[in-house]
Amino acid sequence: MTNQLIALLDGREVGIVNYKNSRLSFTYSQTWRDDPNAYPLSLSMPLGSATHGHARIEAFLWGLLPDNDRVLQNWGKRFQVSSKNVFRLISHVGEDCAGAVQFVSPERFETLIAEPAAREIQWLTEEDVAERLRTLRADHSAWRAASDTGQFSLAGAQPKTALLFERKRWGVPSGRIPTTHILKPPTGGWDGHAENEHFSLQLARSVGLIVPNSSVVRFQDEIAIVVERYDRARAGGRWVRIHQEDMCQALRLYPTRKYESDGGPGVQRIVELLREQSSSPEEDVQSFLDAIAFNWLIAGTDAHAKNYSLLLGQNGAVRLAPLYDLASILPYPSVDMSKVKLAMKVGGEYRLRNIGLRHWRKLAAGSRLDDARLIDGIRAMAQAMPDRAAAIQKQIEGEGLSHVTIAQVCKRLATRAVACQKLLQLSK
């Protein structure tokens, strides 16, 4: 059993994770540190220091794994390792992660380098994909088939799988070839969640937010929301991994602190981070606050720190990543809206129905932004939302996708948009 993992960024060796006496460390290779185009594994582990200790690398690694204890326990049983040992888990699923990073054993590294790219893809039929989605709905830990060479990990609580889509074919990649799309089947009691997420992403784009492409795709009798990975791109005849990390990783926080109420970062801390690290700080701060406003308007209650990320690139470039995992709580009648809270406070207030003009003014002041400009932007977004939502509903239905959840969210968004405009006119 290995006690070292080689860290790769888009296929280049950048350092080593060491595991000794239940403690971790990460050391950058000198070759990577000397490269003028180098970028850090994490903003919490800058290139200026060659070695970083246990707390930093452990928090980063946990941030790559699912936020679901049951999934981790099942993975532990499957791989015969402790579900509480992040190093052992990553040893098995770290070959395709969020961002450009891969973690592989020294033995696997030699095979990976020597293996022809064409042998790294297991192509699937539509029936194969349907069966994988069916299995995943029944067993939320079945992100990959046991026989797959390629294993992957993504953060988040929802069951999902990741596949390569190329030349109109789906496949399971491994080694140097990354997954390009994330597939999420409908789950649990949230009927129409796949449609809800797809609709919310389209709505966000319509009001000027940057989001990945998405669609709801049917594979025989199974459906899934299919989201293009923004941390993948085609360049120079190959798939390129683009590095990213979520806000918890960037701030050296374990994923258990993703919610502000659990000690995680709130709006002000993320604004500070963007001002400290972003290559275009004011543009990214504005985009982030637009996202906060959007989630307030649609009642997107799960926009915690792990659902905001940073793109890390050459020459120290850092930018806010596209938004993802957007969804509205509005179409679910069993939810008591008087008790609904956001994942991050707005001007000191969590509760959705209590957030008004003075809270946005307080948030603007804490973010060192002109409050009139911020609030005018939110009003404009609220005013535009009902018509944009109706247009998207019509477009989606024209593409053959119809679900009561979409109709419900459109209907309730129209009412909520009017209510939010009134809240922004009254000082509460």
Q: How should these model regions be labeled?
A:
Residues 1-428:
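Phosphate/dinucleotide-binding and metal-coordinating scaffold of catalytic cores
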